[in-house]
Structures are given as structure tokens and as C-alpha cells.
């Protein structure tokens, strides 16, 4: 009886379900997608999702506490737009524009933490508010115009050579993603911060 329960709990665990869904989708598109398994398709897929996965590492800590952050996409967009405006219209050097991008997104994180921890606003409501706030600020600052960062070949394009450069056709961003995954996994499993987050979410 215990053995049957352990097998059932194994197959019903979230990790197994998530992995099974991923394998199913991969097999489905491999069978019915004409060019899905080509090298160009795989590289393009990795290049388009690695930064989203990096954002998901941070979201894992938030969800493990029993909370949620609805603003993460709009905050990333707002930071990128303000950084683009800083470089294109305010004529700041690219390193300053990147620092401004980080500071803007960090400020929204601090605001979310203040609203949730100090003002006792539910995470769903607080982050929904900052989501629209970030979206509005991004639209106002950029005037709903596309902001372009320097191309790889320009002197200011050094950061793209760091993050977008390929290693024998393999995107460097994916390598950074794997490194961040190892760091985040270690923090989540073996550090006080990770265990504290899980303890809060389990209570």
C-alpha cells in the first residue's frame, strides 16, 4: 500500500508533471512541425527564451513564498525603454544607460516589497498596480516609439558582443542562463534565503 502511494505521489509531483508536459510538447512539434528539429530553429528558440527563463529564476523565489509578481514583464519593458531613451535621446554612454535600466527595475522591486511587506497589500493587487504603473511610465518616457540599442559592430555595442555572441553557433546567453540556474538552484536548496522562502510559502 505504501509502495503504491509513493509511486502515485511520484507521478503526481509537480516536477514530473511539468517535465512530462515539456517532453510531450517537444515530441508533438517534432512530429508535426516541419522545421522544428533543425539547428536554426533550435538556436532561434533558445535565443528567444533564455532571458525569460532567467526572469523565471527570480519568480521561483517569489512563488515559493506563496506570493506572485504580475509586474515582472512590464517592469523589464519599462527598464529597457528608459535605458533606450537614455542612450538615444539623452545621449548617455551605453554603460550609463545599462545602469539606469538596472536601477529602474530595482526601484520597482523595492516598491513591490514596500507595498506588500509594509503596507500589507496582497501581492496580486500590489504587483498588478505596479504592472500598470511600469507600463504607463514606459509609454510616457518613450512616447510609444521603438528604442534601439547600438548594433554589435559599433563601439557601444560591446554589451551585445558579450550577451549575443555565439560560441560555435551556440548562443552565449544560454550559457549564462545555465550558470544562473546553477546559482539559483544552490541558493534555493542550500542557503538560508531559499529555505526561508519555502518555509514562508509552506506555512
Language-model regions, residue ranges each:
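Transmembrane alpha-helical segments of polytopic membrane transport and secretion proteins
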Residues: 1-20, 28, 37
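Interfacial loop-to-helix junctions that mark the boundaries of transmembrane helices
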Residues: 7-14, 39-47, 90-96, 161-175
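Hydrophobic alpha-helical transmembrane segments
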Residues: 15-20, 45, 53, 74-78, ...
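Structural signal for alpha-helical transmembrane segments and their membrane-water exit/capping regions
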Residues: 21-37, 65, 141-142, 185-194
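Single transmembrane alpha-helix segments in multi-pass membrane proteins
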Residues: 25-90, 115-120
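Alpha-helical transmembrane segments within multi-pass membrane transporters and channels
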Residues: 91-131
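Transmembrane helix-bundle core of multi-pass membrane transporters
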Residues: 123-191
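Short cytoplasmic-facing helical segments at TM-TM junctions of multi-pass membrane proteins
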Residues: 193-203
Amino acid at each position: 500500500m505504501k509502495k503504491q502511494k509513493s509511486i502515485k505521489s511520484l507521478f503526481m509531483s509537480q516536477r514530473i508533471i511539468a517535465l512530462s508536459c515539456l517532453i510531450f510538447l517537444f515530441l508533438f512539434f517534432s512530429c508535426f512541425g516541419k522545421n522544428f528539429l533543425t539547428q536554426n530553429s533550435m538556436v532561434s528558440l533558445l535565443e528567444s527564451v533564455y532571458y525569460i527563463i532567467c526572469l523565471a529564476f527570480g519568480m521561483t523565489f517569489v512563488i515559493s513564498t506563496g506570493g506572485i509578481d504580475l509586474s515582472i514583464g512590464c517592469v523589464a519593458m519599462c527598464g529597457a525603454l528608459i535605458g533606450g531613451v537614455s542612450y538615444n535621446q539623452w545621449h548617455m554612454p551605453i554603460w550609463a544607460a545599462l545602469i539606469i535600466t538596472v536601477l529602474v527595475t530595482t526601484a520597482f522591486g523595492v516598491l513591490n516589497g514596500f507595498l506588500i511587506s509594509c503596507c500589507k497589500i496582497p501581492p496580486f493587487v500590489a504587483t498588478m498596480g505596479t504592472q500598470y504603473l511600469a507600463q504607463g511610465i514606459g509609454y510616457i518616457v518613450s512616447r510609444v516609439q521603438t528604442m534601439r540599442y547600438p548594433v554589435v559592430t559599433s563601439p557601444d555595442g560591446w554589451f551585445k558582443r558579450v550577451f549575443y555572441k555565439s560560441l560555435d553557433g551556440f548562443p552565449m546567453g544560454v550559457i549564462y542562463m545555465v550558470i544562473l540556474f546553477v546559482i539559483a538552484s544552490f541558493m534555493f536548496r542550500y542557503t538560508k534565503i531559499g529555505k526561508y522562502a519555502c518555509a514562508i510559502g509552506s506555512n
